[in-house]
Amino acid sequence: VEYATVAKEPELYLGCWVAWSGRISNAVTEGSSYRCDLLVGYENMERVEGFVPLFFEEAPYPAIDGERPVKVLAKIQVENGKILLNGRAVYQPLRRNGE
């Protein structure tokens, strides 16, 4: 499901799993957990479709590199009408393009 579709009526997608790509910002590790903002659609650094808080109970390993795009598998949560993601898995290439 696309971000724009979910953003229109987030409650309809409560508990659904999505695989969204983008970039990470404002990352914080607290104990064994990890939280950040996912800049949905910003993998090519051209256009941000939306900002979504993303939380992992266990910090991803290896650590996410904020300088490179990611794809996350996460469950949609809704709080006060806003989309939140409960992360399950992260895909991030080990090398940057051209390395």
Segments predicted by a language model, with ranges:
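OB-fold and OB-like single-stranded nucleic-acid-recognition modules
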Residues: V1-E99
